[in-house]
């Protein structure tokens, strides 16, 4: 699995973290100051990269969490049928089918950028 461990205090807004076993992009990060006998706590909120579900995480700032290594790749649209597009990876020429986001207009020969993590893909 392409992921690494980091301390919660090293996380930043806009980066990725694993929450509930799925990669999420961090929307907000806040810390509560430490109490008399405890350590500072961090609250992390984010949206799932591939499923857009909202998730949150509350941990001490020195706790370790998994950070996914999400690859950003280039592809070319081969064909578009309905809401699906056939994409060819420009690095290894592998073809696969992906769902086209509703807010994007695609036509054959367009070059796109997509995210990939453990077989899951999403057009950016």
From Swiss-Prot:
SUPFAM superfamilies: Nucleic acid-binding proteins, Translation proteins SH3-like domain. GO terms for biological process: positive regulation of translational elongation; positive regulation of translational termination. SMART domains: eIF-5a. Transmembrane segments: none annotated. GO terms for molecular function: ribosome binding; RNA binding; translation elongation factor activity; translation initiation factor activity. It holds the Pfam family IF5A-like_N. Keywords: Cytoplasm, Hypusine, Initiation factor, Protein biosynthesis. The modification Hypusine is found at residue 36. Functions by promoting the formation of the first peptide bond. Belongs to the eIF-5A family. This is Translation initiation factor 5A. The lineage of its organism: Archaea, Methanobacteriati, Methanobacteriota, Stenosarchaea group, Halobacteria.
